Amino acid sequence: MAKKRAKKRAPAKKRQQKKQQSQMQPLWFEILGVVLIGIAIIMIFEFGIIGRGLSAFSRFLLGNWYVALPFLIIVQALIFMIKRQIGGYKHRIVIGCLFILGSMLLFSHVHLFQTLYESKVLMSNSALKETWKVLITNDGIHDQTGTLGGGMLGAVLFAMFYSLVDSSGATVAGVLLLLIGIILLTGKALIPFLVEQTPILMNDIKKKWAAREKKSVKSPEEKRKESARSNRKSKPKPVDTSEMEAVQENPEPASEPIISSFTAKIEQATQPEIVQEKQSKAQEDSTLDPKDPVTDYPVMGGEQENESYVLPSAKLLEPPVASDQSGEYDLIQANAKKLEKTFLSFGVKTRVTQVHLGPAVTKYEILPDTGVKVSRIVSLADDIALALAASGIRIEAPIPGKSAVGIEVPNNAVAMVSLREVLESKENNPPEAKLLVGLGRDVTGQAMMTELNKMPHVLIAGATGSGKSVCVNGIIMSIIMRAKPHEVKMMMIDPKMVELNVFNGIPHLLAPVVTDPRKAAQALQRVVSEMERRYELFSHTGTRNIEGYNNHIEQWNEDHDEKHPRMPYIVVIVDELADLMMVASSDVEDSITRLAQMARAAGIHLIIATQRPSVDVITGIIKANIPSRIAFAVSSAIDSRTILDGAGAEKLLGRGDMLFLPAGASKPTRIQGAFVSDEEVEAVVNFVIEQQKAQYQEEMIPTEVEVVAPHEETDELYDEAVQMVVDMQTASVSMIQRRFRVGYARAARIVDQMEARGVVGPPEGSKPRHVLLTKSKLEM
């Protein structure tokens, strides 16, 4: 009996255990769901080492769609908690989400490889290798700024579809995956849904279209009501004088928007009358008296247009040489990481937002964190150069127009910029601008061109071999290739005798290239006289500048059927100012100052270059009147401040690397100058000379400078002193002092007179002067 009772109790215990297990099974699913949701939250917010590790693993798998993994985990957890069974991964919603995710990964990877191909960074055809390089080699899984595509899963999908149906087919496959995912996610077939919804959509469109047409068609009665309403609105209201007095007595000023709006209305109301008055006055002023023809005031350099003249083509210049900068692309990501780590090691939190690869330097745009002083970033220049192993860096803090700091790092290989590619660029290149000159390309690679008549004068300075003469040649070539000889004339002064002589004979010259420094001051004075003569013309014709005068000449020619020449622009080019300042500093400085102050309206522009940017060459008066500056590499920050009124030029690389500070700009722009070879210059010059010979203006050619010895009244002891010096064959001031018992000033004056007349030679330090005259010549 006892055994039978034990057998009966055993099944009862098993049933109780099974009952407890069946009650606990839903709780396990609840616990599993809660744990999965917790893991997903840790992944999303990257809590601790586990969160960051899971997030990095998610980026490795899914790339830029790494957030989808924790959300898929949350969806799976909810299915566990609701369905209370394993196998939820086969659920229709989960499968639909996976299809949609796969399409997004494929789209992202197609875009990633298009970007890599356009950036010329793609080194192989293997999608898996290139993705591994982006994710692991370049530390992409820890960098949240760059694009990662679809991760390794996206790389597998892209590699599979690319090998089967190419890149375009991979995009089509992505669309198909997206449609399949939407169908599975919604649980509705696509075609029946479209068949059901299309008529409803078409009816809505028809109703809206009919309502719009009905609203646009108005009855005659409605039109009359609208016209009456508009008349009542436009009818002026009577002015209440009491309100005006109250406004006048009110001392509180009106708010700024009201004042602005009120002023704009007044200007709009009174502007037509003022414009008509100005036009009538201008017509009265510009109308010449028939008794005073235009030819009473001839313009130097004016000539009739040679209609057969053809501008030189850009094909005469060498085509740009393609440069390989693939090595620089590999360094960009690594240098960006080094910059962020270097700043972080000094307690400065920053982020690299943008990188510009230029011809000579790479510019990294740094966005500092809130509360970081710009001065702290600038003070770390040497540490940044050490971290990047760079020869020298330049920091632009801040970048004008941006809330970022620019760090310019020299490239390992400098890409040459040709003048042809700059002149052929479509950026800032109006065809009607005759004085548009090409300078080069900036850090972002954009062609930099500027109009000389807007500068209006430019000072170019830099050390020897930094690229000044090439820049001057590029400016001259730009003008020759855009302007005909009757439109622009030039006066060239080249004391070095080798830089500008190649342009001798071109029809744009007013006079042959001036190479004698003593004639240069005279040439500048001739240009000043031409400027004064032009202002007399402006006064006579009632115009204010060269553009107004040329418009007046065209109107005069049309009205009187005459052909008076237009007034040409004049560009004065001085290749070495230091030599001129040594020979005739006062005359040169006065002429340059007058031209810089007044010549802009007369159409005369200065281009002055020097390799000695010191204060005795670039004086304060010259700097004050020449607003635009171009600085090449200099030896010290003092020279940079002399040119730009600020440091920066001492960190340039040379070979055309320049800082361009146009008039009105707050900070200079870094440019890699355009290179033009001697062969290109000769080709263009020969092409121009073959079409038209130079017609020099006699009034602008400097005359021979005669060196006349000063024949002032000689000292009464002069003849005796000469006789003594010739007899003794030696001469000195102290000897004349002792022999004739005179003071030092009188003795020195006698010796100077002897030197001026060729009796004695120049001083040789502490030695006596050498006597040039012999006794036989003296007796003759």
Curated annotation (Swiss-Prot):
Q: Which SMART domains match?
A: AAA, Ftsk_gamma
The listed locations are: Cell membrane
Instruction: Tell me what this protein is called.
Output: DNA translocase FtsK
Subunit structure comment from the entry: Homohexamer. Forms a ring that surrounds DNA.
Query: What membrane topology does the UniProt entry give?
Result: Multi-pass membrane protein
Q: What does this protein do?
A: Essential cell division protein that coordinates cell division and chromosome segregation. The N-terminus is involved in assembly of the cell-division machinery. The C-terminus functions as a DNA motor that moves dsDNA in an ATP-dependent manner towards the dif recombination site, which is located within the replication terminus region. Required for activation of the Xer recombinase, allowing activation of chromosome unlinking by recombination. Also involved in chromosome segregation into the prespore compartment during sporulation.
Alphabetically sorted, this entry's keywords are: ATP-binding, Cell cycle, Cell division, Cell membrane, Chromosome partition, DNA-binding, Membrane, Nucleotide-binding, Sporulation, Transmembrane, Transmembrane helix
GO CC aspect terms: plasma membrane
Q: Which InterPro entries match?
A: AAA+_ATPase, FtsK/SpoIIIE/SftA, FtsK_alpha, FtsK_dom, Ftsk_gamma, P-loop_NTPase, WH-like_DNA-bd_sf, WH_DNA-bd_sf
Q: Where are the transmembrane segments?
A: 31-51, 60-80, 93-113, 145-165, 175-195
Cite the binding residues for ATP.
G465, S466, G467, K468, S469, V470
Q: Which residues lie on this side of the membrane: Cytoplasmic?
A: 196-780
Name the Pfam families on file: FtsK_alpha, FtsK_gamma, FtsK_SpoIIIE
| Basic and acidic residues composition bias: residue spans | 212-229, 275-294
The GO terms this record gives for MF are: ATP binding; ATP hydrolysis activity; DNA binding
State the PANTHER family in the record: DNA TRANSLOCASE FTSK, SPORULATION PROTEIN RELATED
Where in the sequence does UniProt note compositional bias of the Basic residues kind? 1-18
Q: Tell me where in this chain the FtsK domain is found.
A: 445-641
Could you tell me which species this protein originates from?
Sporosarcina ureae
Family designation: Belongs to the FtsK/SpoIIIE/SftA family.
